[in-house]
């Protein structure tokens, strides 16, 4: 109980410090902050898994950081986090050195994100189904469905 409270307080403080420039430039402060994010993520806190997963994916040092970031994003997406599911879809569609782009897997993650209320995921699904992709045939009905869902979630195209 006390350790969980300490973890929550440390995470809260680290999230507040994240918005200041100085702690991010200090190696010891940054290491402490990452420790707080990792601790809360390990305790199963979905927002911490999503936040730290994004940090590791985009700012992590080395190949292991990227893989850990994807693992945390996967856990967060399975816990219902729409941003994490959206980012996993983006990563699946982009592919990397070890795997080909996978449009069907991207569609699965974006469907989860859209169900969680992520408007851009619904819009990207509409585009994906409108154009089709390797392994995912074009489907105008699905495209229209997700375009309507994106609008209902608040997506407004530029222009």
Language model region names:
Residues 38-40, 74-76, 111-113, 150:
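Canonical positions in the second alpha-helix
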Residues 10, 43-46, 58-60, 79-82, ...:
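Short helix-capping/linker turns of helical repeat alpha-solenoids
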């Amino acid at each position: 109980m006390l350790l969980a409270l300490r973890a929550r307080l440390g995470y809260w403080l680290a999230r507040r410090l994240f918005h200041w420039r100085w702690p991010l430039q200090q190696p010891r402060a940054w290491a402490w902050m990452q420790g707080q994010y990792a601790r809360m993520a390990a305790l199963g806190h979905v927002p911490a898994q999503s936040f730290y997963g994004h940090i590791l994916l985009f700012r992590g040092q080395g190949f292991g950081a990227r893989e850990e970031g994807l693992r945390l994003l996967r856990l967060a997406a399975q816990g219902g986090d729409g941003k994490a599911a959206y980012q996993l879809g983006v990563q699946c569609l982009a592919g990397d050195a070890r795997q080909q782009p996978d449009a069907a897997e991207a569609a699965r993650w974006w469907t989860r994100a859209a169900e969680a209320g992520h408007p851009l995921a619904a819009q990207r699904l509409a585009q994906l189904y409108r154009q089709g992709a390797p392994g995912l045939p074009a489907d105008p009905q699905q495209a229209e469905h997700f375009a309507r869902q994106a609008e209902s979630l608040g997506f407004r195209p530029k222009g």
